[in-house]
Every structure is written in structure tokens, then in C-alpha cells.
Amino acid sequence: MRRTLLCGDTLHALMSVYTTVTRAQLTEWLKNYSLGDLQHMQGILSGIENTNYFVTTSRGKYVLTLFEHMGVAELPYYAQLMAHLAARGFACPTPVANCHGQFIGELNGKPALLVTCLPGESVVHVSPAQCGQVGTVLAQLHHAGQGFTQRMLNPRGPHWWKSYLQLLRSKVAPAELRLIESEIHFQAQHAHADLPHGVIHGDLFRDNILFERVDNTGGVNDLPGNISSKHGRIGGVIDFYFAGDDALLLDVAVTANDWCLRPDATLDVEQLAALLRGYRPDNKYSNAEKSAWPILLRAAALRTWLGRLGYNYFPLQGEMTFTKDAGLYQRLLQQHIDAPAHIDTLI
């Protein structure tokens, strides 16, 4: 099963559009760009934090994002990061500057950014081979980000956990609160200063990697179809708006907690091993990384659980919205506590 994210195709699924943009409004806004005439616009599936539209003009296909929470001051980091990665050959959206040379504009009272549209679609049910590709592309992202000089503290790191807990304190059940507080206390004892640090994506879930399909002739295309016997290739990585600086292995843990997650809140061992091998083909993880791995899996589960609790308790009002299961990541965190996963048993 795949969740369609193809540029310009019709979507028959739940969507999230918090700020509605009319065709007339977008046409007027695009006069600030040298992109030709507007041909088509459409709300995009799966956005939770922001409003997204596919935009097709006479000169190409793009994605328009209206930022519902972020201020203008925060956004140049993300635009410059994507520009940096794209310039180094990494497959990610390229920000489009307006006629004044600016990436960030304003539309309907919200900061807005236009980026190029990548080929492919996100997957829901994944294979070990795809997990291996995900590990490889994550390693490529970390390598491409090495020369990026701007700095941004991980926006979903420990400082955020603590502040967000205060918002949730009156909402969550006592047992949930105890688990969150206990885990935050546990994580505070592990700074991971001895691990490699750099730019992390921070949110490399299944809906943020696009796979191109392999057609019946063996060629690659991005049209819907059955590729159960062929896995396709990654067309690109999207949604960098949780990026920041942190331990690189934390990014692997966040990714593993989604790509290898089973419905029973355990990680698929075969998929996890494939992801770890894809990320580091020589399997040479340092002793510090091996020791940190089960701790980082817990940190990653906590981060996602808190985020999903927030989406459910404090939903944005939108034209088309949906929520995600927070309890799954509570159970995953408890699983990581009760049965820690160790790299040595996987590679």
C-alpha cells in the first residue's frame, strides 16, 4: 500500500490544509516569481504541522508550504539547508527565490516557501530492501550536510520535551505523565557528547521519503502501480522543517522507529538490520555508538510520542485535517525500556 504524493495527481484520501489558498490568491502571489502561469493547484496529503499545496505552472511543478507555527526568523535556516544539500547533489527540494532574490514570502498572513517538486511517492508498507535504501540515503544526507555552517538546535530535543510536557501535563493520564517524566529524567543523564554530531533531518518518516516505481520493463517511473517484486529507487527526501544539529545516530533512531515499526509496537529485526547496514555498509559502529543506540531509540520514541499527543490534544483548525496514533509510540517507548535493542545483535 502506498500513500500517493505525486505532483499533480488527484488525491482520494484525508488531507491537512489549515490555511485555504484560492486560485486567485495564488495567481496574484506568483507574480512575484518568474515561473509562468498557474495551471493547477491542489492540497497535499499528510501534512500535520503546515499547509502544503502542489502547484503546477507553465514552467514546472512545485510545492508551496505555508508555515502555521514558525516565524519568518526561523525559516531561512531550513531554506538555506535545502539549498546547500541540493547544491551538493543530494535529492531534496530546491527552494525557489522570488524576483527579489528571497526564499521566504508571505501568503494569507503566513510565511510561505516554494520548492521544486520531486518525483515519487511515499510508502506505507515497506520491505527490508527499502529500509536499506533509507539507511543509505540518510548517510548521504549526513555527509552532504557536513559543510553547512549555519546552526540550529534540534527543535525536538530535550529542551522541547520539557517545555511541551508543561502543555500536556493537565491533559495526559497519570500513568502517561509518570512515564514521560521518568524518561526525560533518564535521558538527562546521557548527553552523547562522544558521538558524531551534525545536521540531522529529525523527521525521516515514511511520508518524507519518495520512492519512484519500477515499471514492467524495468524502467523507473513515478506512476501508481504494483511494484511488489521490485522496490524502485528513492526519488528524494522532503520536509526538512524539524532539521537541526544533534547526534547523527539519533537521526538513525528516529528513522528506524518509523520505518521498522510493526503494529505491535516492536521493531522488525530484518528491516532494522537492513537500515543499519545501509547507513554504514562496513558495519563499523563505535563502542560509544553501540552503547548509545538503545538510549537513542528511547529518546526518538519519546520525541514522537510527545508530538503526537500534542497533535491530538491541540489540533490546528483546518479545512482538511487528520490525526495520528499517539499510543503506538507510548507502547514503543515502553518496549525499548523493557527489551533494549543492541546493534551487535543486528549486524
Predicted regions and their residues:
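ATP/Mg2+ or Mg2+-diphosphate-binding catalytic cores
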Residues: 167, 304-347
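An alpha-helical support segment within catalytic cores of ATP-dependent transferases
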Residues: 19-32, 149-153, 161-202, 206, ...
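All-alpha amphipathic helical-bundle segments outside canonical DNA-binding/catalytic cores
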Residues: 285-297
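Short secondary-structure junctions
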Residues: 31-38, 88-91, 192-193, 283-287
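Active-site activation/catalytic loop segments of kinase-like enzymes and analogous catalytic loops
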Residues: 249-284, 299-316
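Active-site acidic catalytic loop and adjacent metal/ATP-binding pocket
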Residues: 45-57, 63-64, 95-96, 185-250
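Regulatory N- and C-terminal appendages and interdomain linkers associated
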Residues: 2-42, 327-347
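ATP-binding pocket architecture of kinase catalytic cores
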Residues: 57-149
